[in-house]
Swiss-Prot record:
Enzyme class: transferase
Residues the record lists as binding [4Fe-4S] cluster 1: C60, C65, C71, S301
Family: Belongs to the radical SAM superfamily. Lipoyl synthase family.
Organism lineage: Bacteria, Thermotogati, Deinococcota, Deinococci, Deinococcales
Domain spans labelled Radical SAM core: 72-290
GO molecular function per UniProt: 4 iron, 4 sulfur cluster binding; lipoate synthase activity; metal ion binding
Cofactor binding: number and manner: Binds 2 [4Fe-4S] clusters per subunit. One cluster is coordinated with 3 cysteines and an exchangeable S-adenosyl-L-methionine.
CDD domains xrefs: Radical_SAM
Major localization listed first in the record, in broad terms: cytoplasm
Location relative to the cell: Cytoplasm
EC number: 2.8.1.8
Organism: Deinococcus radiodurans (strain ATCC 13939 / DSM 20539 / JCM 16871 / CCUG 27074 / LMG 4051 / NBRC 15346 / NCIMB 9279 / VKM B-1422 / R1)
The entry's keywords: 4Fe-4S, Cytoplasm, Iron, Iron-sulfur, Metal-binding, S-adenosyl-L-methionine, Transferase
Name of the encoding gene: lipA
Record's protein name: Lipoyl synthase
């Protein structure tokens, strides 16, 4: 009898029509370079306390990010807006899938802004689940959160890693005009692997068109995208993806190793060595990106603040207003 590939099984059903993926992590042998330390420390504990007290969701927890210990111990976190239930079911993602039925926490923008103040953050990354159940995909809520942060913390830089909003450029503009400093939308993988890696409603070309629109509409805003490696892509496909991103006006590109969250997700096809990640970065920099961050444990928001911080006086003219030098150092 042939056994079914666990990655093809449907997520488990739980109450209220919400589907939850198996929360038991995969126990697979990984290369030495993928080992991380267990999260500890006073700052890590304080950040976790603030997140819990304000009923916030972080992508650090929901997506089982391997950098949670390092980032939280630095006193920074990526906030995940609009709940922890995503309307899409990408086969790489550990976030729960279901129908949030239009529910939103209207106090969330203020709660996030207050948390940023309490944590004394100088650079904040906001992301969210996909909310196809909302007419605007959550764009207004996203923009409201950015504005709330800027009102309470006017010097704080804000990066918005948004859904594709179904390609609705009016929704993209709503976020762009909220005061955001960096606009990101993740390509996730190369063209050939977009399906089955991403939800069927996601599109390689749509993501590129959203990023291109963002750069055309607001040249002063940094544009950014991220890809996972180890899903079966070839080096030539990676080069093609980099060229596509550059043609769309993307400023910053990140590459990281795909890690399988549970047995319900796609398996890892290959572990890419740190040396190969370095080679990919060099190829990307030769294409003219502002920065290419490439490494096994890199995620789209990993050390995002340093992209600007490490370049005092060296930003292109259209981004020179973001030159904050050492002022962007986190607590």
């Amino acid at each position: 009898m042939t056994q079914q590939d666990p990655s093809t099984k449907e997520p488990k059903f739980i109450k209220n029509g919400i589907y939850r993926k198996d929360s038991v992590p995969v126990r697979e042998k990984k290369p030495e370079w993928l080992k991380v330390t267990i999260p500890t420390g006073q700052v890590f504990t304080e950040v976790r306390k603030i997140v819990k007290e304000h009923r916030l969701h972080t992508v650090c927890e929901e997506a089982m990010c391997p950098n949670i210990g390092e980032c939280w111990s630095r006193g920074t976190a990526t906030f995940m807006l609009m709940g922890h239930i995503c309307t899409r079911a990408c086969r790489f993602c550990a976030v729960d899938t279901g129908n949030p039925m239009g529910k939103l926490d209207l106090d969330e923008p203020r709660s996030v802004a207050d948390s940023v103040r309490l944590m004394d953050l100088k650079y904040v990354v906001l992301t969210s689940v996909d909310r196809d159940d909302l007419p605007d995909g959550g764009a207004y809520h996203f923009a409201k959160t950015v504005k709330a942060i800027k009102e309470v913390n006017p010097q704080t830089r804000v990066e918005a890693l948004t859904p594709d909003f179904g390609g609705n450029t009016a929704c993209v503009d709503l976020v762009l005009d909220s005061g955001v400093d960096t606009y990101a939308q993740n390509l996730e993988t190369v063209r050939r692997l977009t399906h089955p890696v991403r939800d069927i409603r996601a599109s390689y070309d749509r993501t590129l068109s959203v990023l291109a629109h963002a750069k055309q509409a607001r040249p002063d805003v940094i544009t950014k995208t991220s890809l996972m490696l180890g899903l079966g892509e070839t080096r030539e496909e990676i080069r093609e993806a980099m060229a596509d991103c550059r043609a769309a006006g993307v400023d910053v590109l990140t590459f990281g190793q795909y890690l399988r969250p549970t047995m319900h997700h796609l398996p890892v096809e290959r572990y890419i060595s740190p040396a190969e990640f370095d080679e990919i970065r060099e190829e990307g920099m030769q294409l003219g990106f502002l920065e290419v961050v490439s490494g096994p444990l890199v995620r789209s928001s990993y050390k995002a603040e340093q992209i600007v911080m490490d370049r005092p006086g060296n930003l292109p003219e259209h981004l020179s207003h973001l030159d904050g030098g050492s002022e962007l150092t986190l607590i």
